UniProtKB/Swiss-Prot annotation:
Belongs to the bacterial ribosomal protein bL25 family. CTC subfamily. The keyword Membrane does not apply. Pfam families: Ribosomal_L25p, Ribosomal_TL5_C. This is one of the proteins that binds to the 5S RNA in the ribosome where it forms part of the central protuberance. NCBIfam families: bL25_bact_ctc, PRK05618.2-2. It comes from Porphyromonas gingivalis (strain ATCC BAA-308 / W83). InterPro entries: Rbsml_bL25/Gln-tRNA_synth_N (IPR020056), Ribosomal_bL25/Gln-tRNA_synth (IPR011035), Ribosomal_bL25_b-dom (IPR020057), Ribosomal_bL25_C (IPR037121), Ribosomal_bL25_long (IPR001021), Ribosomal_L25_dom (IPR029751), Ribosomal_uL5_bac-type (IPR020930). The keyword Lipid metabolism does not apply. The gene is rplY. Part of the 50S ribosomal subunit; part of the 5S rRNA/L5/L18/L25 subcomplex. Contacts the 5S rRNA. Binds to the 5S rRNA independently of L5 and L18. GO terms for molecular function: 5S rRNA binding; structural constituent of ribosome. It comes from the Bacteria. GO terms for biological process: translation. This is Large ribosomal subunit protein bL25. Keywords: Ribonucleoprotein, Ribosomal protein, RNA-binding, rRNA-binding.
Length: 192
């Protein structure tokens, strides 16, 4: 898993008024929890987290909070403003070598599906899968081979197995499918 360096400053004031003042200065209130004791409240700049948030990749965040120390964490939750889509709060989860974490990992389809060769269209239904594992065992992406996928067939979460990972999505959830295109459907009707 790739690492991302992030530095924050401790947060002194709390509440709605203080949070609004922080956001006016292009800063984002954040919290780190999951370690021993209470959570660490801090502030990060909007520019510092842009590459972390707006990326399809997953990162292990090496977080340094001035006066509190350094932590290894993952991005747990991001809250966006419902109208402006600005980031209003970020939650980080501290990770350790012995405690498993749950996070979403991007799905990458490999191979050329048989159904696509027959005129179908490959459709990725789930871009990310929720997995549970030690953070050191979580891969950057989940590769799924679709070479044997026929026209009209799907790959469901229950059919997938990755060593050291537990998939948390519903077993019958469709990850990808080869669907019949309108052109192929029209050609089939004309033959009849």
């Amino acid at each position: 898993m790739k690492t991302f360096q992030l530095t924050g400053t401790p947060r002194a004031e709390f509440g709605k008024k203080a949070a609004k003042a922080i956001r006016k200065e292009d800063q984002i209130p954040a919290v780190l929890y999951g370690g021993k004791g209470e959570g660490v409240n801090f502030i990060v700049s909007q520019d510092a987290v842009r590459n972390l948030i707006y990326s399809p990749e997953i990162f292990l965040v090496e977080l340094t909070v001035e006066g509190s120390g350094s932590y290894k964490a993952i991005l747990k939750e991001i809250q966006f403003h419902p109208v402006t889509d600005r980031i209003i709060h970020i939650d980080f989860l501290q990770v350790t070598d012995e405690k498993p974490v749950v996070m979403e990992v991007p799905v990458v389809l490999t191979g050329h599906a048989e159904g696509v060769k027959a005129g179908g269209k490959l459709s990725l239904e789930m871009r990310k899968l929720k997995v549970k594992a030690l953070y050191s065992e979580i891969p950057e992406k989940l590769d799924i081979d679709v070479s044997d996928l026929q026209l009209g067939k799907t790959i469901q979460v229950g059919e997938l197995h990755f060593e050291g990972l537990t998939l948390m999505n519903a077993k019958n959830a469709v990850v990808c499918a080869v669907k019949l295109t309108r052109a192929a459907r029209g050609a089939a009707v004309k033959k009849q």
